[in-house]
Amino acid sequence: MRLSDFDFDLPEDRIALRPAEPRDSARFLVVRPGQAVADHIVSDLPDFLRPGDALVFNDTRVIPARLSGLREGRTTGGADGTPVAVEATLHRRLAPDRWSAFMRPGKRLKVGDRVAFGGHEGRVGDLGRLDAVIAEKHDGGEVVLAFDLSGPDLDVGIAQHGDMPLPPYIAAKRGEDERDRADYQTVYAREDGSVAAPTAGLHFTPQLLERLKAKGVSLHFVTLHVGAGTFLPVKTDEVSEHRMHAEYGQVTQEIADALNAARAAGGRIVCVGTTSLRLLESATGEDGIVRPFADETAIFITPGYRFRTADVLMTNFHLPKSTLFMLVSAFAGTEAMRAAYEHAIATGYRFYSYGDSSLLFKDETC
């Protein structure tokens, strides 16, 4: 498969810069195999589910993972010895004091450089600023930052000095503000660790969750900490050559047992978002049994993949040539998704993290 197979024209004004208010008033496109697409709103979701269905959410919580600061001057002097403004997006925690991050400008950074994030008048290690050393440097602007703080103290420092890591297509249009601290977080988020929101979940309100439970739909929570790699474009012309960044996920024994029981009783597994789906697929064997999982996953789903768990997927509208558009094409069929996206663009649906949503029923013929 070629990357161009997943391209389409998306007008720039279709990318939402703010979420719908209230959250569940966003538009909702229902896509069933062999049927015409249907326009609804997210609050209609209970109408498409049955008692006994199991809804699976990702309860990760977004941390303010975008840090701005200065690379301190080097003793060598010269142009490279002067301080340089830098920006880091934390990607994955490696140790109590270490994070993998994407950092720019990458060409101005070397192993051993000191970086001061936040205020620049504090002492090293003081919460007045956040200090780190570049311990490793890799391709694509990825570095390992060794902070002077560790554990809970580092968490506090990041919370004080970091900004919410809005996706590039939104950040290019406007800066992060205080509204995003609430808007870019699901109402059920509880496990700190993501640098991007599981955006399908942003549409849920406490009232909608109660209506789902009243319908007899069970609610289950798994955790996948979404990394900054979710923002990276595919750079290979041949799709199979692309490599995903690993992300940590967890499915408990209790959740695995509950999902297996729901399926055995005839209920459908409904994944809220691609992160929930990717994690469940990683935790499920070829026999279709969900098992406890606590590990990293770099699963990359493209057309031809045989799904083991999910029957229905709720997901936002994704960007051209993205790994997520490849995933939904694998789930609901490439031609069906092209037709659905053409309809969405023509009728004014809003795309991407703060945009509208869709409900996809799996096409078993894919």
Swiss-Prot record:
Compartment(s) of residence: Cytoplasm
One Pfam family hit: Queuosine_synth
Pathway annotation: tRNA modification; tRNA-queuosine biosynthesis
Keyword Ribonucleoprotein: no
One GO CC term, this protein: cytoplasm
Keyword terms of this UniProt record: Cytoplasm, Queuosine biosynthesis, S-adenosyl-L-methionine, Transferase
InterPro entries to which the protein is assigned, alphabetical: QueA, QueA_dom1, QueA_dom2, QueA_sf
Function: Transfers and isomerizes the ribose moiety from AdoMet to the 7-aminomethyl group of 7-deazaguanine (preQ1-tRNA) to give epoxyqueuosine (oQ-tRNA).
The protein's name in its UniProt record: S-adenosylmethionine:tRNA ribosyltransferase-isomerase
